[in-house]
């Protein structure tokens, strides 16, 4: 059976080479060719012995996922629909800024968590992505963007904030992030790789031990009653448990704060009282806030908070001494903004079908 070498981080690749009678150092060579240089043809890997190249050509491949569609926004944001087979596709977004280039990477085909304000969740869930399908998004984007003439990185930051809950696909996501961090591959620092979770507490503890990168938490509500409703995983891991997990995570994190993401939903979670409740629940967690104006999608049932309400909410947090950013909406014209990623999901949960039936009855 043909082996896709993009599924291996360097440790797994060393095991693979030992298994075929080769020295483990071949793993470092292969990592550089695959990821640093973006080469998928063994014949072009000139410092690898010809006999080994011929052997690899018979039993292995370097096979990134294919791009079904590429779109470029008026603001320079780029979105790729990545074909992952069986009628499924995931979306990857590159956001260029003056001081950085951020790639937003998906971890699952759809999402099983069913947050009520998220377009991805509305699509249901099909499966976890493999390591090659996760790191392949970075591979594909690097190829498409080319090299900066000045030698600077075009992709300087990676955020695991695309489709899916990364910690629900723990092993594959961590293996892919290890490739991102590997100096023989992409060489990103732990501070420049951010994982966003809705709050899978046991997996947060495991991540702290196995691959502590920068942490963002999709909080979105300042009390359990509201969070139970809009972020259903809160029923399993309520806010007190989540805050305690954040404190534990910071013991080994590369940054000394957690970023709390908070989508601004008109009349739902955006009042001054909500802001004061938010200050109360985070008081023991060093943090900053990222306020996200809701990006509408069809039949969402929500509206974006009014600008004055967002400013009032922000000011209450800032007056308490916190760093607060309000996320700029990028790529909205190509549905690449936060919460808009939907891809193509062959839903195995039948969630989307159930919702259609409910809406039809209503």
Curated annotation (Swiss-Prot):
Q: How is the cofactor bound?
A: Binds 1 [4Fe-4S] cluster. The cluster is coordinated with 3 cysteines and an exchangeable S-adenosyl-L-methionine.
Keyword Iron listed? The answer is yes
Q: What is this protein called?
A: Dual-specificity RNA methyltransferase RlmN
Additional info?
Reaction proceeds by a ping-pong mechanism involving intermediate methylation of a conserved cysteine residue.
Q: Give the Gene Ontology MF terms in alphabetical order.
A: 4 iron, 4 sulfur cluster binding; metal ion binding; rRNA (adenine(2503)-C2-)-methyltransferase activity; rRNA binding; tRNA (adenine(37)-C2)-methyltransferase activity; tRNA binding
User: Which cofactors are required for activity?
Assistant: [4Fe-4S] cluster
A cellular component annotation (GO) from this entry: cytoplasm
* The protein's role, per its UniProt record: Specifically methylates position 2 of adenine 2503 in 23S rRNA and position 2 of adenine 37 in tRNAs. m2A2503 modification seems to play a crucial role in the proofreading step occurring at the peptidyl transferase center and thus would serve to optimize ribosomal fidelity.
Disulfide connectivity? 104-338
Domain Radical SAM core as annotated: residue spans: 97-333
Substrates-to-products reaction catalysed: adenosine(2503) in 23S rRNA + 2 reduced [2Fe-2S]-[ferredoxin] + 2 S-adenosyl-L-methionine = 2-methyladenosine(2503) in 23S rRNA + 5'-deoxyadenosine + L-methionine + 2 oxidized [2Fe-2S]-[ferredoxin] + S-adenosyl-L-homocysteine; adenosine(37) in tRNA + 2 reduced [2Fe-2S]-[ferredoxin] + 2 S-adenosyl-L-methionine = 2-methyladenosine(37) in tRNA + 5'-deoxyadenosine + L-methionine + 2 oxidized [2Fe-2S]-[ferredoxin] + S-adenosyl-L-homocysteine
Keyword list (alphabetical) reads:
4Fe-4S, Cytoplasm, Disulfide bond, Iron, Iron-sulfur, Metal-binding, Methyltransferase, rRNA processing, S-adenosyl-L-methionine, Transferase, tRNA processing
User: Which positions bind S-adenosyl-L-methionine?
Assistant: 164-165, 196, 218-220, 295
Return the Pfam families for the record.
Answer: Radical_SAM (PF04055), RlmN_N (PF21016)
| Species, as recorded | Methylobacillus flagellatus (strain ATCC 51484 / DSM 6875 / VKM B-1610 / KT)
The main place the protein resides is: cytoplasm
Q: Which residues bind [4Fe-4S] cluster?
A: 111, 115, 118
| Alphabetical list of InterPro entries matching this protein | Aldolase_TIM, Methyltransferase_A, RlmN_N, RNA_MTrfase_RlmN, rRNA_lsu_MTrfase_RlmN/Cfr, rSAM
Give GO BP annotations, semicolon-separated: rRNA base methylation; tRNA methylation
Q: Where in the cell is it found?
A: Cytoplasm
- The answer to keyword Magnesium applying to this record is no
Identify the Gene3D superfamilies for this entry.
Answer: 1.10.150.530, Aldolase class I
Q: What is its EC number?
A: 2.1.1.192
Family statement drawn from the similarity comment of this UniProt entry:
Belongs to the radical SAM superfamily. RlmN family.
The active site lies at 91, 338
